[in-house]
């Protein structure tokens, strides 16, 4: 009997395990080798089975799928026994984690928990007895096998044995590595791996290990967790014996290697060859950089020399062991030796041409293996001749007319001894349209030729006679120079390199400075020779039109003459003439200024960003458009649904530099919800103070998240504010933390004191305080010394010391005075400044917690060294450094002796032993090259140090008496020298302007110090904002002139000083060459103006500090200005519950900061003098999902009596009397709390102030509810109240409880309870057992009495239903009647769910967004975007014509015209298209792509496309087809074949359909990416002789498609390019299946999946939009005539609905039948169709589950795990099944809830819902009352959006690729009891039938020790 029972249990257990797919609890099982499977021949399918997949070789993400012609099951609930029995007829061997499920009634798929393992053969069996509803039946098993990719070993050490070259030599104890595509069985690798010496049969064995870095990590990428084949499996090999030197080996992996998890062993050898190192030897001298298309990098015709050795060298030893004789030129970096290299390069510029050198290699040259050369090697080297070259200055160069500078063309060894050149005199007006020489000159073929004669290897300078060419002493010349310099080979042809240089040279004596503001301009002209201002210079201003298409004769928009100071001012009217027609309010003007004096002229051009950066300010541009400086703020910013919110708007704005109030103006108010949807809130009118106020009720159904409230005025002004809707239960107590030190040092103790009080005044006596103390590195800078560097720095490759961030965690109880204390010691391991953060969390009797934090800075020393210097210096020049010594507060310390060292940084690589193998490691050395000592004073000390050569240096400063480095300070500088490092030219034109302060008060005098490099100069000095406020022109002398100016209110809130310094003095032709760098320096420095006069002082005085709930409070308000004078004004006053405010820390905004926010310095400027040449030149979330909250609509009332209100009073406009006084009276709600009165004042004159005060409401005896926020039916809770005794007396406390409604006491009397107990002096909790009886609302009332004082409250407690719904769908396409079986179980819950039926005549949706996107994205002049926009315009025109859709503001023909114009400009002479303007050769990829757009456009828009354009393109593509290898980037076969396929497809579009090269292309099919394979299949389908091959590709593609009830998604492997995006793959697959005339329902699913890839109605990019719309148009052509049919829906003979589909006006019908109207049992749903057209249908049956539910994985998989916060041990993990034993958690603790979601295919719009049990509350980390010390584990970033509700967590992902994803959040156990914990659920938002759910479980929350 016992045996029989055991056998029965075993059978049941086996059945359960089978249903679970070898996965009992829905949790991953361990990995083990899989049993072998013999291959089977693909079976012949019976007619009623349509398709099996996959067959042959499958990818890891392929779906196992079986499709049937007829339904196997009716549309019914997922848990019907018949379904489960049918699924037993599907088997997979070996069993993999997962289970079979019905995708639709006609399709079954395997839902895998992991990707299919690599190197595995699997067998799928459909068992005998499997039948459909039409009684087709299998009378025997039907099986087939498929296998995944075989084991592939790559990156083998050494080289391929068939290669002639040897591998890099290896060490005798090498650490070798190889890569596998799958995890391997290590024992089998060791068994089948040998290293065989050359000529031997036996070899060495290896120790094989998986590389540490490759072992799976906790935070692994989602795809790698799901599909291990996505990882690199790298293995380390270590020979078991030492190898022999100078020996060749073969590394052989023989057949038979097993995967760690799989069943297919390797069936072939993997071999490589390698060799050990030989004695170090010199091999040969090589040459690099010979003349080619890019010039002569190696300088000489034969190239630059390199010394090649057989082993890798130690770089430092090479530099000391190579000698060259005769000695080369002394230039830096004569030798170039890279780490891990065996080649030494010699700098060719150190060598002379046609000269023989002797190179001696010393015997001590060392290689990486520690060997030396042993004996010196000497070799001769002849440089040979210099390669031909030509050089001439490019771009614009200005030569001062009085200085004899020349334009030289420098040539050397030109092969033909000639060059070509062209010259043209430039007129001033030419510059309106042209900015470069190449625009002004004829084509190079028309240029004149000039002979050059000179000696070989000697540079010849040809001087261009400028004045002769210009025919004047001044003027401008455009020139172009070209010469043949060398021949080179390309594609078998010999070509000439012909470099072409264009330039402009100007002879002038005029320096021109032009500056523009929104309403004015300034032009200054000085002579270049001596800087004297030019009086009466003629000024002409033109609009700069470099992009103009037509070029009429230019006319100046403004003219004038300079005054005595050389200045011409442009007024507003003149400037408006110059900006007419441009967007003046948005963009700065683009202007050309011509200044002339007699025949001499010069120019400056102002472009959009001229002078914006690099001169001391980041200039803006405000224009004349008003800019908002106002705001909308609320009473408390944080709300719950069902509450009311108040808002006040301040409508201030900045226009033309003036701040104004928008009084008596109408504003349209709009609410923007978290999803971006907008709701109008009507119109508000501002009052005489420029403000308005409004009340807004927050609906009960309002979504959680962040909302924006916007107000738009008629003048375009917009102000806005933000608020948040959340669910929360605010704690009614607070915590304060105080530290006894702000700064601490090593060894110091810091005292922490924490205090906690209830908001109604009583102490939180006996509460638990938890201390969390952490630290992190801080970049500490004493206040006021922000420009200095402090403390040690660790420069690469050094790393800062790592020390633990955790300092201390401790618990303590609050004493009778509500206090707790803790001491922390600053540890001795402190290597750098650290911020110590102290978090204190207090929990009271209700188990709610509040946290607060403070921090202090721990420093290694109380003396801080500050260091300031530039980061770039010149070699050999003194480099200034400023030093200070300060204490942490910023006060300077004097008399401290410090040593400064300038240390050269030397980098090197050393070899260190890691795990027994040699690993290179970077290291750094510091060599002191200069040092000095100084003593600190009360001012910064300046010292100079000189770096001897270029390179990287460290400045190290430390105390002279220091015993360690703790107090040192470091900084890094870069030193430039004679090498090619070039740090930019603009810096030499920047003038340093220093102000004595950063902020001034109005009326103060500011001093500016000008750092002048000139002995004599003219200074233009100004203070500017959007215009010059102060201006001065003065002559200055010496290196540090000073300017003083008075700060005025007009400069509020900020301005900038500007200085333009023009060099004056003796003429420049009398100045020594090289002594003058430039003729002008320009600089700006911003400053702020103090705003204290803009503040009002506001006093708020409540009449009573403490009063009872429900009483009236009187509040006095008083307004004064900053000087204390009474001021009349307006007050916005609110009285808010502090419990809500402390969650967010909200206070109304500081309006002075808002209104007087920093204003842009609106200016642009240019100067022509930086281009002046002074000496000859040498050859040169959705926020929509928000986050937060955690409590229900009633939760706001959980701390209330009967009238809880978070807001007691709000008035947006309280007016004061003339003395600034006002009084309000507030009727208070019943809350026991602290009320905060907050007020914002304004006086109507742009002055503002804030004030607040608090008072409390309390009682002698008071009680507060201790209730959960909700309960579910069946929950048993311990809840009640807390009682605070403020009477000061003890006695008999009486508590009476009453409950009604859906909750009962769990006692003999279910409605009332009483308790008599002795009163305590502190706050005590009293809990009573209760039970949730039914869904609804229970009312809980408690009354307390003590010695004649009493308190009572009544609160609702909501009993929430658990709503678990499931959905089944059936979709399809029909030309006739169709019957769908439906089975509604008689026990189905009747009040929820039902049947939804959607019928449609087309699935093409309304398309508008791509049209809008083209309008915003049409500014790129490239071929691909232009071709994509042309395709979009063409397709939209087709859709518009067919479906009657209209696109506002989008004219298809006009947009097509614009795109064709762009493409015409990009077609070049060979007929192809350049990818971008200026590209010299056509791009074959974009040329082929553009064909489709042009052909489609010519069909839809007749005569739009020039036939010649298509003809030239056709000729070009024929050449590409014939010779794809002519492109340098396309030498590999794969690229050639892909290019040929693209050319064939394009030629076919052009009417030239060919089958040439198809055999070669088809051979590469397996190497093509998925999108190219789809294109190939579609192209092959056009040819009868290629049909089989096309179908094979389609069959393979079908395996890459994952199908569900309504979608078919192409699974795309990770790709490199945008041309293979998921949208492209989906669109191309849809086009292929249309071309192959596949089943209509498959085509519909592909279309639905393509539509699902849209975001905001668009596919994101022009390319994706073009691809998708092309597929949509081809889909639309499946129905050539508009539909005209009648569709009728019947169920069980009853007509549900009927619709006539005529044309595309109303293309869809939706019917819904509620569950209580559906007939029970089995019936047919009949869809009848009569007429012409196609009927698309979707039937969805959804129903609610009853009772406790097991989990279910129906398309998605989810598991839930619970652990203590910050702990690794998992307390419980739940999948499909839950343990019978309840989970018990301790009360008052914090736990981490982790959800793991597995997705086996790409999905869109995924929703995660995790219900909370009533005993737990989610922790909202965004609240300020939450401690940052407790952190949830890391989430997958793809699950970024979440909301916290009182009873659930909702998260969302927009798109997920296959993978394993995790979501974590924290909960706190607050209510003791026994609770239902429903399963976590994941589903697709728009396909809820695809879901996963964990099993429901029981939770017990109990106090510790119970």
Swiss-Prot record:
PROSITE patterns cross-referenced by the UniProt entry: PROKAR_LIPOPROTEIN
Compartmental location: Cell membrane
GO cellular component entries: plasma membrane
Stretch forming the signal peptide: 1-21
UniProtKB keywords: Cell membrane, Lipoprotein, Membrane, Palmitate, Signal
Covalent lipidation (S-diacylglycerol cysteine), chain numbering: 22
Lipidation (N-palmitoyl cysteine): 22
GO terms for MF: endopeptidase inhibitor activity
UniProt entry tagged with the keyword Aminoacyl-tRNA synthetase: no
Superkingdom of the source species: Bacteria
Membrane topology (UniProt): Lipid-anchor
Name of one Pfam family that matches: A2M_BRD
Family: Belongs to the protease inhibitor I39 (alpha-2-macroglobulin) family. Bacterial alpha-2-macroglobulin subfamily.
The protein, known as: Alpha-2-macroglobulin homolog
Organism of origin: Nostoc sp. (strain PCC 7120 / SAG 25.82 / UTEX 2576)
Taxonomic placement: Bacteria, Bacillati, Cyanobacteriota, Cyanophyceae, Nostocales
